[in-house]
Amino acid sequence: MKRSPLRESLIVLCAGLLGACANDNAISPGGGATTPVPVAQAWMTTADQSRLLSRQPDVPIRSGAEASALVIEVDEGTSYQEMIGFGAAMTDASAYLIQHKLGAQRDAILRELFGRDPGLGLSFMRVPMGASDFSTHDYSYDDMPAGQTDPTLARFSIDEDRPDKLPALRSALAINPKLKLVASPWSLPGWMKTTGSLIKGTMRPEFYGSFAEYFRRFVEGYKAEGVPIFAVTLQNEPAYEPTNYPGMRLDPPARAELIGKHVGPLFGRTGIQALILDWDHNWDLPSSPLAVLADSTARRYVNGIAWHCYAGDVGVQDSVHAEYPAKDTYFTECSGGGWAPVYADNLKFFVGKLIIGSTRGWAKGVALWNLALDENGGPHLGGCGNCRGVITINSVTGVVTRNVEYYALAHASQFVRPGAHHIASTTDVGGLQSVAFKNADDGSKVLIVLNTAPAEVSFAVHFGGRSILYALPAGAVVTLRWS
């Protein structure tokens, strides 16, 4: 159809007026500018992957409480824990792939992961002390020939970490200086253990002092390399002894003695500021960290409890916090993998249990397992042969795939900045799960909502005498942000 100049002018005028409204520069009938219409920004990921952290149309913020059958109340006047952030683990496997397989895109990928606007802003990372199941070989920082010991740690060295792990961490810190690192050993040197090996066993009591010194030297060694350690856990998964990769059992009495009589006092005498976290294992055995906290000497030095996702329910974080509210909570490991191939189920789990559930359960930081793995779920020594990283880096081509864990983290990490506080919000409303935060730097509010219902759900968000109306597809997650 042929358009006349008048029709073209009307189209341009109408488009301009619509654009002005969209940009909150509304025109009053008298020709003057009205008060800008406040809006909330929205980003969505859907269960069918048609939208992946996709920016959605802005949502008008209305005065008063909009009527809706389902209402999420957000109360910024009630605040809980201060957040340090979200992230994953810089394992040997992750560091190797970042350092050797990304090629020219390395810096861009690191900026995407650790930078802000528009990066993910990852700010909480876990670092294995020595080898884990995701290393290329077994090692500790003080290995000795069979039958020999080194109680003074004369041969202690972090040289194993210089080729990959330390450079990768320094690069991340250069991008995000607020990055906090929690370090965990999978095994202490074999000569300290009952098996004489990195595999299985527990600590020999005569080397408890060497155990504490091992931690001190690690923290000071990393600091000298420009990589400060925010916190340590005594042992990864201390109730489990793997058979084909480094591991060690540390029962509650041993952990209580190590913390209360060795690691805690040594850190105090030498001025080490790193926090000491207990447990670093699953939700199914809260009696273990509670037994350590029941020891009055150990309790003086325990700053918090770290949790994993592989058994039990996230609700125990809340119950343990209720018994010891002065002790902080951190979530330090959960991996996806080939055993759970359905994207929608994974999105629901990672957002519902970790991003929402764990932070509602007092977690100040939430870290998933490997930041990066290759297309074969490696490199790895043993244990999980089909784990999935937050990103996959193809070991041949260097092509990066952003997995469901990437988007689950991004819905929080990109918007909830270090220093934010978890604030009150209602949840479990008509299949909707939610958690809310208030950023400290600009006062912006962030609400993350997951729809676990089988159909689209319409709801209202009420806050401070204002409200938002929104409709969320089945299985989708949305992050809403407003001033």
Question: How would you name each of these model-derived features?
Answer:
Residues 130, 184-186, 234-237, 281:
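Short, well-ordered beta-to-alpha junction loops that form the rim of enzyme active sites
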Residues 53-229, 261:
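N-terminal catalytic cores of secreted or lumenal carbohydrate-active enzymes
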Residues 36-74, 181-183, 213-221, 225-230, ...:
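Substrate-binding and catalytic surfaces of secreted/luminal carbohydrate-active proteins
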Residues 22-25:
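Bacterial signal peptide processing site
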Residues 17-20:
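C-terminal motif of bacterial Sec signal peptides marking the signal peptidase cleavage site
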Residues 134-138, 189-196, 238-243, 285-288, ...:
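Short acidic/His/Gly/Ser-rich catalytic and metal-binding motifs that mark active-site loops
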Residues 90, 129, 236, 308-309, ...:
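Residues that line or immediately flank small-molecule/substrate-binding pockets and catalytic motifs
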Residues 1-10:
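Bacterial N-terminal signal peptides that target proteins for export
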